[in-house]
């Protein structure tokens, strides 16, 4: 131990030692850091070298790639061979052809041996310029010989010649690098192709460009200022010439048969630096490839000498994910801001100044954006097939999924040989059947893919065309060079330009944007145009706008220009004004059915027109204008049809007004626009299954049904179904919502489940199985009636009553199509349709309905409705809606969205009238009133004929309403541009819980995203569909839930999976909320006079608190008023506006009653079935002598009025002590609750703030007592239960002992246990035992766990006697006992033997005893 005096010396030594260690440690760390920094610098140098080399390697992969060169050469030879063998022997060698092209580089072939006509085909020696001229010749002669029979052949030839021209251009730098091994010289040689020195000496076809555009702008200004010209946009395009609809040849080709004009177009585009676009077209792969090469040449020093900027090949860029492609582009274009995937590219791009971005980067931005969109569109379209992909999957998994689906294995196979590909049999199969697809040859084999393209592509249907493009896409995404080369001839990469026309603007408006761009350029600068498309030249936006204008407007010999042809085709041929209307009907991966495919220059025209027709193109660069243009895609297209917040009364009356004023011939025009077989498809879209009369027998006529013997008369089926929904709603706040729906009694055990940590997920999507058991039970009880049983079971069904046969057919159809059946309803108002009803009764009913509705709503006005079941044939319905939707898009100048919907409804009414062959003309006919309008010999028909009779009978009255409801759901969804975003929103992890929430309607996400409940009632369904879900007392919630299920099916048809699940899961919760809301709203508005009276009183008191004088003297107290003058000093108390101390004592009385009513209303928190039913559980063994109480529905019952009293007590308590809070609730009553939009958001606010405060108040008041009651109840129940079990188990043993003691006391102590039981063998004991188990039993207490419900005792026998026959009755004389068998019986095995009976009871979906009556079998 260190002494006190030595302590300072010891501390000094310790300090010096630590100091030395610290210094050494610092030195060591410094040395380590130096070493690390050296290593880091070394690694950075290595990485720098790698990055430097990587730039060069990326360029080499484009112009020094042996594999790419090899594949391009192979495809070139395949194309040359196919041109030689092509059935279309063109172009012919005519007089003057040799002056156009160098014949020495072409092969000449005779068409036939006997014919002197010769056609020419290119060779390997043909250059790029030779193929350009060859393409001109083909187009010239194709226009001359065109007819519909050779249309596909022309398209195919034009595609492969354009592909050959692209290959020739791609091979130029590849061949150069192969010869010279110099990257820059290879790029320069490519550049030489577009450097045309001879063009400088030639005169331009439009003369001086500056003068031309000056005159153009003057002409435009004159037209705009001329008030006499009505359609200025059309005049700008067509001029003074009124062009009528032209021949198909003029539509299909951009130019007429004039090679000189084609060359002029090439020269114009070259002069403005657009040569690449002109020769390649908007092919996403080819144009991107050469744009990257152009960028490499322009920035060669930065990319490959200074190496300060990263460089990537186009093929490598496409290999990245959709978000990373933009990161790479930013790195290549040396942008300061790099894109991150957390935000949309549009938002991040527009935040940074991009005004100095080169045109090449702008075009690459456009190409990447629409390649991503193309990729998503292809993947989205797979949802129509049997396998699903999603856009965020890794590329490897997309490939694996695709081949797993096509080949049943992730390994590659030739998809054309698979059974999956052959399902769409629109082609002749020349290959033998194979059990296993060929995996030795790659799926991306150039020869096979090109062979199938040339041989069969034109005959492919939608799915096969999709598979071909998806195969190529998987190769591109996984950096397969063969797929990169194969993409050059696929039409989908040209058609992608169509996706960019999304705005709902007229074509002439888009053209005005191009004119504005030219005006801006002309006023800002007078720039001399370049004379070629030199890749080193900087192309400006002005070059692009002017070049695009000249390309689209050039013409010769008064032949219409491309722009004029396209405009006439839209406005007069198709009779539409918007390009987007045309594009929406075209598929991006489609085959030769697209008319644009006759001439690829149509795609070039659309591409150049698209780049220069964005709204902000005059002020922004191309990419900025593009992103600003698609900004509108994020906004909701709000119309009367799609806007779910639109006031429903206004919407209803507007809809009826439009229907009433639709021209009579508009329906006829719609029929003419449809295909010939569409009307038959409309008839097949729905199949009615459950007949109205069948449901009415169990509902409206339930009192006429004979009750089963010993049981009460059954309640109406719609009442039972409605009660079930309300019961689910009442159980949901306690956490018992849909938990184990098969057994409603399971909620008694849920507290024990929580303690045992056993989780049972709610089965929310199987709620209809419970309803199925209720419906089947009701039908079974009907068939158990004595007279029905005698007719149906014990007599020949040949002479059976039509009504009984209809009942049996309806339930059979329902059972067989249970998963697809939907139930709709209509109002059942007999007096309205019966001519014998006196007029005064009709007037009386109308007045009563008005009085019932005017101060609230029409909730529960009718008890019963007309309920029927049907199923939707989704495939046929989808085809019908697609056709009608395309008709609408093509004819927006004729139809608005509302008028088109009502025209379709009138068309459905016409179809409905074709079913009315059996209906009587008089309205009073019972057949018409109760829909028994089936054939008189209905019961004698066979099953198929009876099903047709049911369908025709129901369709004669309800086809139009039912079909139109399904159609409007699909049409309004397709019309809205918000559904895509909404589906994505509900796919997010934070919103998935909203779909499964039992109170989703009170969550902000549910309301903010559009409240699917309001979407169903006010957007997806027509106005008449709201009647049954409001006015029916029995069945309204059941019907509304079926509306949700129909919406789920419709969303699923449109591949909105998340919205489909949302509707499916909310079919019960939201439907219940709507019904309860309507009932509360109905009664709440009845208190308008009372609420107004108290509001006036409150205003007067507020005036008194602030000024000291009442605004209305009548509300002042008599003691404070003298001679009609108020005493100001007695009232003035401004702080009372927030809290009134004087009324606190009075309010406490109401607080007590509020507390008391909470005990009753909140009992479910601890007692799932309520406190009363919980007490009854103790007496379940006692048979009740009374019938069950009538099931409750969403109406004015005991609980409702108790809640009303609770609300009054709450108001009298808190409104009195705080006027500020009272005014807040008054605002809600008068304003918020009367506007649906405000009411939904207020509900969310009320849940998170006001209700939260109420819940906290309850936690310290009523909830404490309820919890205490629960604990006391469980304690008493457990004590009594244990006592009963112990007594029940001891009772049989006591009886045995008593019996033996009474019969033979002398031998009682000598008897063994089985002797006692043998003595008691003729007795049996039965007791109630719920299989409780006693823990920690001692040896003397083990008998407590020995239990049996029914224990018969068998006399002991010898083991040898077990095999004796029953006739050996004297064997008991044997005295020798070898081994005795046990006299105890294994009751569990006995129960297993009787499992056939017990299993039926265990597995049956027995419904609640408050609702159901046991079946009789």
Curated annotation (Swiss-Prot):
GO terms for cellular component: cytoplasmic vesicle; host cell cytoplasm; host cell plasma membrane; membrane; rhoptry. InterPro entries: CLAG. One of its GO terms (biological process) is adhesion of symbiont to microvasculature. Residues 1383-1417 are annotated as: Disordered. It is a single-pass membrane protein; Peripheral membrane protein. One of its GO terms (molecular function) is cell adhesion molecule binding. Keywords: Cytoplasmic vesicle, Disulfide bond, Host cell membrane, Host cytoplasm, Host membrane, Membrane, Signal, Transmembrane, Transmembrane helix, Transport. Residues 1394-1411 have a biased composition (Acidic residues). The keyword Disulfide bond applies. It is found in: Host cell membrane; Host cytoplasm; Cytoplasmic vesicle, Secretory vesicle, Rhoptry. The chain crosses the membrane at residues 1204-1224. Its main location: host cell. Disulfide bonds join 333-361, 407-413, 517-545, 521-542. It comes from the Eukaryota. Residues 1-24 form the signal peptide. Participates in the formation of new permeability pathways in Plasmodium-infected erythrocytes enabling the uptake of nutrients from the blood plasma. Self-associates. Component of the RhopH complex. RhopH complex is at least composed of CLAG3.1/CLAG3.2, RhopH2 and RhopH3 with a 1:1:1 subunit stoichiometry. CLAG3.1/CLAG3.2 mediates subunit association through independent contacts with RhopH2 and RhopH3, which do not directly interact with one another. Interacts with RhopH2. Interacts with RhopH3. This is Cytoadherence-linked asexual protein 3.1. It comes from Plasmodium falciparum (isolate 3D7).
